[in-house]
Amino acid sequence: MYIRTALLTAGFLPLGHGLPRPQITYEENTGPVGGVDPPFPTFTAAVGDLRGSTDLQGGIASRPPTSGGDSAIVPDPELVNGQDADADLGLYLDFNSATAPNGPQPIRGGLGGTDPGPRTFEYEKLNPDLYAPPGTDTGDVPNAMWPLGLSHNRHGTGQEAGWARQQNTEVLPAATAMAGVDMRLSPHAYRELHWHTSAEWALVLKGSVRVAAINEDGASFVDDVTAGDVWFFPSGIPHSLQALDEGAEFLLVFDDGNFSEDETFLASEMLLRSPKEVWAKDLETDVSALDNIPQDQKYIFNGTPAPSDIEKQNTTGSAGSLSGPDGYTYHWSQQEFHNTTGGSVKILDPLTFPIAEMFSAALVVLEPGALREVHWHTTSDEWSYFLQGSARITIFKAPESSRTFDFTAGDVGYIPQAQGHYVENTGTEDVIFLEVLQAKKFGDISASQWLALTPRQVVKDTLGFTDDVLDKLPKDKTLIKPGNTNLTALAGGSS
């Protein structure tokens, strides 16, 4: 009776119905848990009481045995390469080789213990450094990672026209200075004419987009951008976006962590929220011209294909058109990478894209085992987005806290101003990620360069390094450090 009542009370067993067949099967714990021993018989009608007897209260009910009762012991726990190593080595633990029910386990260097309880193993495999943290992690650091795959997806109003999902302070509270949106437009679909109070910096991820806007002087702008290109619209600048023949997906970054994609100023709503008489006067037309305006916002909707000749849409007034340093796009895809040992980097900031006066970005490629060197940014928080691969970041927060987070494609990272961090490729393929700063020039302080350029006596007296170590420190910033693709080599593990 107790088990049946517990199931009914917890909502695990629908009244009058059998247990539904699971739609998706995940690798998870099995067997008895929480006083319930599945699988449970099905019923065709409600049976049993919702509440138990007062005889079950403490001091009245019978007590469980101290030995031989329900067991929380995990027999033969499975450890992966590196888990037995010194916890302070902090080796990356690849839990993908661990199999249920004996692994993964939150153990590192003899610390922690087995996990017999409710769990979905996929989370632990994606986040090994949270589940079995390096011994160097300590204190409290706000969450710095949000997977956009967990964000609510807002669909467009047109038939399969597209969608958008966002990250802001509602899901990542630490990200106070920037927010992001991942948007998809099907072929020829529009993001409705709109504007917003935040500035918008965008990177095209897939496909191509035609962008159009005007500035306060009435100068117009239209251009086509493709994967790897960037556009920027200052606060309040009205604009439209239309996917070209192959559709598009793009990443938007805003200079306000509280930005919401659901609170932009839409042209359709603008027409609906003032009297028709006023609009007729303003547009110098008859009131009847407003009979066919949309009765609701259009947001993302299907449209007429854009003409291949962009000049057909290059409408100008007496103020002319915008281009060059006044233009709203930068064809970043055509910029070559700076290549170095371990990876590649290219930078876009106001030195070459002046209209985006407070947005600076780096697109980074890390080879397997490589490291975006330990660094920090002096004047800006860092907003990061991972386009490919898997990586981890440890964030150092003064005076003595640190935490390590794991990232895969589609994840957003956020590191507050001046907090030290690195990015390490933990996978078998290249990691591609974007760093975005609110700064007039992209820059950082390199920890190794700082130590190399500080008087040697000071470094030796402070940190205890030998001359041999200091002799090898580069005096020029390296940005990327190559590394062993076998991340457990220091423990004698195989790759």
Where are these regions (language model features)?
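Ligand-binding loop in jelly-roll beta-barrel domains
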Residues: L19-Q23, D224-A227, F232-A267, D381, ...
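Active-site-adjacent segment of 2-oxoglutarate/Fe(II) JmjC oxygenases
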Residues: G247-P307, D430-T485
